[in-house]
Amino acid sequence: MEHDAALLSSSEIDRIGRRIGRPLVLVGMMGVGKTTVGRKLASLLHVPFVDADEEIERAAHMPIPEIFATYGEPYFRDGERRVIARLMGTGRNTDRKVLSTGGGAFCDPATRALILERGIAVWLDSDVDTLVERVGRKDNRPLLKTGNPREILTRLKDEREPFYAQAPIHMTSGAQPHQVTASKILRAIDQWL
């Protein structure tokens, strides 16, 4: 029942969607649900969904773990910055879409400034226990290959939260259905605009 109350009607979604004239950019830790919630938001708003990590892999012609292994994190971050800049567009080309970013993207000062200037940044947050459980489902996280995932996630979360906190919208991704999280994000954006 409480989930039903959190959902928006299609007319509310349409009204909010008309007010959003730029990309919605999901930022936050790996495993928080940016891609899944982003797809749901894009579906609700009838706009394209773009996963920055997929675009980086397409541009580099190799998967992200291979980029990290072959060239290192600084090289990856440089490519990530360029790809996100392209995806954000410029001037009138800053179109409506939902963009999911990698966990470290918003920590880069140039990328963060670009997102804050041209988009609406939404910090999707979760507790470490949830992150550990979710990232354990996949074996494609280069930053977790070097030690205990819980310790690494705790450290990364502590390091990155001051950057994520600069996003104007902050939403916790918990056990509720993704549709509920997406509706809550749209309500928060509606109040912020």
From Swiss-Prot:
It catalyses: shikimate + ATP = 3-phosphoshikimate + ADP + H(+). It is found in: Cytoplasm. Keywords: Amino-acid biosynthesis, Aromatic amino acid biosynthesis, ATP-binding, Cytoplasm, Kinase, Magnesium, Metal-binding, Nucleotide-binding, Transferase. Substrate binds at D53, R77, G103, R160. InterPro entries: P-loop_NTPase, Shikimate/glucono_kinase, Shikimate_kinase/TSH1. Mg(2+) binds at T35. It is an enzyme of class 2 (transferase). Its main location: cytoplasm. ATP binds at G31, V32, G33, K34, T35, T36, R141, Q176. Binds 1 Mg(2+) ion per subunit. One of its GO terms (biological process) is aromatic amino acid family biosynthetic process. GO terms for molecular function: ATP binding; magnesium ion binding; shikimate kinase activity. Catalyzes the specific phosphorylation of the 3-hydroxyl group of shikimic acid using ATP as a cosubstrate. Monomer. This is Shikimate kinase.
